[in-house]
Amino acid sequence: MNNVRQSAFARAYTSNILSIAYGKDILDILVAVLPCAWVYADYGYRLAAEFADTLDDNPYKSWVDMYKTDEFWQDSVWLLEHIEKLVADASEERKRELIDIFVTGVENEYMFWASAYDMQYTWKPKWNQER
C-alpha cells in the first residue's frame, strides 16, 4: 500500500473523529463513531443480501462478511442504546451539541461513500482541473 494517499473526504472524516477523541468526553466520542458503526452494519447486511450469489469472487468479500454479522449489528445497537442512556439526563444544549456531532458524522459518511463510489480520491478546484 505504498504511494496510497487517503482521500480528502476520508481525511476530513478521520480528522474530525480524532479531534473529538482528543478533546471531548466519552459521550462525544461514542456519538462521533455511531454513524460509521451504524452505516457499516447496514451496508454489510444489504450488500450480503443483494450480492449473495456473486460475493465469493469479490475482493470485498471479507469486508462484507465481517459487517454483515448479527454480532456487528448487535454491537451497533448496543452503542446506540448506551448513548441513549448516557444522554438521558443531559441538558437541551448538550443534546444539541451531540446532535451536531452526529449530523456531522452522517455528512462525513455520505461524502466518504460518495467519493469512493465516484472514485474521487483527490479534490481539485475547478481552476486546477485538467481540460
What is the meaning of each model-derived region?
Residues 1-74, 107:
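Active-site-proximal alpha-helical scaffolds that flank and shape metal-associated catalytic sites
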Residues 24, 61, 68, 85, ...:
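Context-gated lysine
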Residues 38-41, 45, 80, 84, ...:
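Structural signal for well-ordered, non-membrane alpha-helices
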Residues 69-103:
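Long amphipathic all-alpha helical oligomerization modules
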Residues 98-131:
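Acidic, carboxylate-rich catalytic segments that either coordinate divalent cations
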